[in-house]
């Protein structure tokens, strides 16, 4: 994924931090549309999303979270934050029967963490920043992250996997936090 890192560097001079929407903002439930053409606008979006994700700090960000309703995700689960991956029009083409439980958090739900069960391995097909199709087998944290971010593209937030009681408590907490800001 050196291409994404290269593009990130190339656009660094013009990058902007984007505002991250917070749950329960209704715009987080909007389904993202496919990207028609991978062009400089999309590459700039990837760079801006990466800058925003690193600054937050986070390990993944979907365009939906920054109020851009197109199928674009950036992820970097590396310890050194030097393995940026961009996924344009991602789709899961295979998932294992095995499950894993990870404690998830989200930049759109700051301060909230809870366990979510997901397939432990997935294969993703997407476009890179040059508009070329690639496939990637994911496991562990990368598999969790790609599924979490793809949920955002479908208008779903991880807390919606939790019980109705937990969801209600989180909504109340987030609304109080928003009023305090």
Swiss-Prot record:
Cofactor(s) this protein cannot do without: Fe(2+)
Entry superkingdom: Bacteria
Organism (species): Burkholderia multivorans (strain ATCC 17616 / 249)
General remark: The submitted crystal structure binds Zn(+) rather than Fe(2+).
Pfam families (UniProt xref): Pep_deformylase (PF01327)
PANTHER family reported for this sequence: PEPTIDE DEFORMYLASE
GO biological process, one term: co-translational protein modification
Function description: Removes the formyl group from the N-terminal Met of newly synthesized proteins. Requires at least a dipeptide for an efficient rate of reaction. N-terminal L-methionine is a prerequisite for activity but the enzyme has broad specificity at other positions.
Molecular function GO terms recorded: metal ion binding; peptide deformylase activity
Annotated positions binding Fe cation: 106, 148, 152
Keywords associated with the record: Hydrolase, Iron, Metal-binding, Protein biosynthesis
Name of the molecule in the record: Peptide deformylase 1
